[in-house]
């Protein structure tokens, strides 16, 4: 195995950190930070590095991850069959590569490839859910979560008219049905009008609105929002329902589920590009967002044989659409300051319809992007909803009109006036004011009370800004001392006795908090919800974590240990070390900890019975292909390598096993034949 050079390892760590942050924002907070194109490009780069240097790959890494950790405000439920993600293609060549990989795995010749049949389904931009039925009764509904465990949102799903409460007697004794909850474009516009009318923040897009509506602690809020569901797959089933995916969709229809009427059976792979082109033309006329098409092998027995690779099935692929575009005028470029001090340029636009959504703001990413695209205030610009979620400016439209001067990016914070520095190798300029910068203080407080952090009901962005301006809350610990301002609160508009008492009760409920939520709530750069959970599981207690972080100075043994934690890495370790090097941050943390009653440790995740084993396959296997055997081993928690070493736990000997069998004997490593492997794997 080739060991990765330092430059590759550093780039891999940076990509891991970025992808973890973006995953947490998209799946955990329903607030995507980057476009699909940016995300997919970063993930492809990560996969290429891991392909070249396998030692960089870890089972906790972004290449193996699906979704985000479930929110503990809801009950957690372990899926009977994991809810995984999909790999993407963007053109006919990418799809041909998918078909070729399927053929190689199954050992098909050209005739076998031509005989493959597919089911095409529009890829709905919503929230994936799993519905469990037992003895014909709907008993549980969960979100995807991290793919292994999801959030129990049964009470909210019971408000959806598209979900049958009972299945007919022919249904299996126990079955999981997968679907996508979404909000139509017309319902989204109506909902946002209602949000604005009552002074609430409008939703960014239909997906965010659907996800936010389903993940309400009050089911009556969900009931008031017209959510819909398309059923599209099975998870676990106690007895077979069909032999093909198409027949399964027909069965779902007969049970009372809504299946997307645009789903189609496709007899030959060569017909797929025409279907893609047709649906791409029609997508803007649909009353719901789609960002691509999912193609699945129709034969369920072939799906079972193909299984999964990492986080995605081998038998399905998502063909993603290019983003929809429009032209409008750039009115203003505003520089916003985030909780980590990042200066982010936001474009204010003349409102324009892009793919059925009215857009008036767009991201410009950073100063390099502004300079590279040469966009200026007053320009006509080409805009796209990248990944159908985040509006982004592609560049100016050539025009004979006179242009304004090039935009000058500030080198000082527009809020506090501190120097805004740009670290070598980074694209973002950051305010150096830290927690002396009002913008960063307020944004960190908003982050701390957010749903995936302390989740304090009644204390949202608007309240935090109001209480900050009034001087009631200036640092995290002040939240738990808010009762000191009770009389003043009761005199403020909109704060009566009932609302104040409810707020105090919600605050008191959060004096007991999981360690992972505390770590995440601090708003440290690069520390997403998943990283926070990894740290909490590793250090177990607040005292252990705090002591280790204080000791993690540059070049220290503790700093090296921190960077070596699976899924953390050097980039995240550097941010933690920097945070704890500031005395003000330590004082703020300790002040907060004094207000808390109990900081709860995280439970370690359950593992497969081959977890921790390093397995090598050698020779020819007769009952399955080598990739199939590898997939089974990895699913059971093992790591599969190509070479035998002292770290190898087991060598599986197929027919005509050669030098690897000999080396295993020399090193005294356990070996089994193929039948022994099948017994070990529970086949």
UniProtKB/Swiss-Prot annotation:
Keyword hit for Secreted: no
| Annotated positions binding Zn(2+) | 413, 416, 431, 437
Task: Please tell me one Gene Ontology term that the record gives under cellular component.
Answer: cytosol
List residues binding NAD(+): 36-40, 85-86, 121, 144, 180, 296, 320
Instruction: State the function annotated in the UniProt record.
Output: DNA ligase that catalyzes the formation of phosphodiester linkages between 5'-phosphoryl and 3'-hydroxyl groups in double-stranded DNA using NAD as a coenzyme and as the energy source for the reaction. It is essential for DNA replication and repair of damaged DNA.
List keywords of the entry alphabetically: DNA damage, DNA repair, DNA replication, Ligase, Magnesium, Manganese, Metal-binding, NAD, Zinc
Enzymatic class: ligase
Q: Which GO terms describe its biological process?
A: DNA repair; DNA replication
User: Its catalytic activity?
Assistant: NAD(+) + (deoxyribonucleotide)n-3'-hydroxyl + 5'-phospho-(deoxyribonucleotide)m = (deoxyribonucleotide)n+m + AMP + beta-nicotinamide D-nucleotide
Homology family: Belongs to the NAD-dependent DNA ligase family. LigA subfamily.
Q: Which InterPro entries match?
A: BRCT_dom, BRCT_dom_sf, DisA/LigA_HHH, DNA_ligase, DNA_ligase_AS, DNA_ligase_CS, DNAligase_adenylation, DNAligase_N
BRCT domain residues are: 605-683
Name this protein carries in UniProt: DNA ligase
Q: Which residues form the active site?
A: 123
Q: Which cofactor does it need?
A: Mg(2+); Mn(2+)
Single GO molecular function? DNA ligase (NAD+) activity
Q: What is its EC number?
A: 6.5.1.2
Tell me yes or no: is Nucleotide-binding among this UniProt entry's keywords: no
